[in-house]
Design a protein with these regions (language model features):
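Short acidic, low-complexity intrinsically disordered linear motifs used
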Residues: 1-13
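Polar/charged side chains located within well-ordered beta-strands of beta-rich proteins
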Residues: 11, 22, 94-98, 151-154
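Zn2+-dependent metallopeptidase catalytic core
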Residues: 14-46
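Active-site scaffold of zinc-dependent metalloenzymes
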Residues: 46-84, 93-100
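Acidic, low-complexity, intrinsically disordered interaction modules
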Residues: 79, 84-87, 104-105, 134, ...
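Post-HEXXH active-site segment of zinc metalloproteases
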Residues: 83, 99-129, 133
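Long, well-structured alpha-helical subdomains associated
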Residues: 116-128, 135-191
């Protein structure tokens, strides 16, 4: 319940940024012939996920975040290939699942608040690997086999960024004094 006010504030502020999967694919530039397959897959597997697309107001290169059990936000400002933005949407949507399944807040946020770097690094690797596995498998199912074959290692680079993320979160927690993880994310992206 403590996160409810954060969710309501986010929803109130950003309903204008809510996009359908069809709108997302169009705005990020996915080729028309691929869209029906992706839309069908998304509607079967991710229909509960609400997608927000807008330019983040952040000096940090944050590409996307999840903001609850079924809310993701993607940074429209960062230049990246269309299939990478779709990968990012899938990756963040898996973080929604992880949050619903439990353990995410304790491993990802509470460890930073408590200064437990080692526990954070282990949880971070596990959560990111799982989200990447899901996104890569989903991209293959949506017709991006070739792209995943060529780019999987690069797309998995975030799995090795735990130290950087820990430091950024630590600094931001001290600077903005968030009430919870979602408040931190909201403040990081300028919502």
């Amino acid at each position: 319940m403590k996160h409810l006010s954060t969710f309501k504030l986010f929803e109130r502020l950003d309903n204008s940024t809510l996009v359908t999967i069809e709108q997302l694919l169009e705005r990020i530039g996915i080729p028309n012939p691929m869209r029906p397959t992706i839309v069908s897959w998304w509607n079967q597997n991710r229909s509960e996920i609400r997608i927000h697309l807008f330019p983040f107001n952040s000096p940090q290169p944050i590409a996307g975040v999840f903001l609850g059990e079924n809310i993701i936000a993607l940074n429209e400002r960062l230049p990246m290939p269309p299939h990478v933005k779709l990968f990012l949407a899938l990756h963040e949507s898996r973080h929604c699942d992880q949050h619903r399944e439990g353990g995410f807040m304790e491993g990802y946020y509470d460890t930073v608040v408590n200064g437990d770097r080692e526990s954070f690094l282990q949880a971070y690797r596990d959560f990111e690997r799982d989200a990447n596995d899901f996104a890569i498998q989903s991209m293959r199912a949506c017709g991006f086999e070739r792209e995943m074959n060529f780019e999987e290692m690069r797309l998995r680079g975030n799995e090795r960024a735990g130290d950087m993320v820990y430091q950024m979160m630590s600094n931001d927690i001290q600077r903005v004094n968030p009430v919870d993880f979602f408040d931190l994310l909201k403040k990081q992206i300028g919502v």
